């Protein structure tokens, strides 16, 4: 397992970090490399796309260093705004509204969900499970719900119990096309449906 940690500073003080874990899973065909990310920022330094951009940068470096490896992003997202951040930048991020998940994605997700306890299947390609709940105030929870969008509505439909610690299991194949699509959409401020 590799564990890059990216720290963000402002005037010599740490204001946030993104911990990116890369786990190697052996399968009958070939090894899979599963990337996950956990980020946190001080309140005044949020909403600047640092989490996604730093993850894309690390992943591009890994992809260039190991071009033949199957690399996937799999994470249980515990907030609707975080789901929106990822789903709005790539059409290859699943699950998503009105788009069935490809079979190879479901197979990888099946491997990962077997590593968690109390996984609930809420539709054909939607899985949730209990996660460690980030510290949030009631005001923050209300604000998370007030930002309506197609992606947030999808998240809320399938994970209305996120505020008690349920996380939506999400997946994205990290091939070069997906990474470039996400990077361009972030840099141009463009969102996908």
What do these predicted regions represent?
Residues 1-10, 14-15, 26, 63-193:
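Terminal substrate-recognition subdomain of acyl/acetyltransferases
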Residues 4, 35, 58-61:
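Short, hydrophobic/aromatic alpha-helical segments in well-folded domains
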Residues 7, 13-23, 35, 40:
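Conserved beta-strand in the GNAT
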Residues 21, 42, 58-65:
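Mid-sequence acidic-hydrophobic segments that form the walls
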Residues 25-31:
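A short, polar/charged loop-to-alpha-helix boundary motif
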Residues 31-43, 56, 75-76:
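Conserved acetyl-CoA binding element of GNAT-fold acetyltransferases
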Residues 40-47, 140:
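Short histidine-centered catalytic/ligand-binding loop motif
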Residues 46-61:
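Conserved acetyl-CoA-binding loop-helix of GNAT-fold acetyltransferases
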């Amino acid at each position: 397992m590799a564990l890059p940690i990216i720290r963000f500073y402002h005037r010599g003080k740490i204001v946030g970090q993104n911990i990116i874990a890369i786990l190697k899973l052996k399968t009958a065909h070939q090894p899979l490399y599963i990337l996950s990310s956990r980020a946190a920022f001080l309140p005044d330094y949020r909403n600047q796309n640092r989490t996604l951009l730093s993850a894309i940068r690390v992943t591009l470096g890994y992809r260039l260093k190991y071009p033949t490896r199957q690399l996937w992003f799999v994470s249980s997202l515990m907030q609707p705004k975080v789901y929106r951040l990822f789903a709005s930048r790539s059409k290859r991020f699943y699950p998503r509204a009105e788009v069935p998940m490809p079979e190879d994605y479901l197979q990888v997700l099946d491997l990962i969900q077997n590593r968690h306890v109390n996984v609930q299947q809420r539709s054909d390609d939607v899985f949730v499970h209990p996660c460690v709940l980030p510290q949030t105030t009631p005001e923050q929870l209300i604000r998370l719900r007030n930002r309506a969008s197609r992606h947030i509505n999808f998240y809320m439909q399938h994970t209305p119990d996120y505020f008690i610690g349920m996380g939506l299991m999400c997946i994205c194949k990290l091939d070069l096309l997906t990474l470039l699509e996400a990077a361009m959409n972030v840099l141009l401020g463009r969102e996908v449906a």
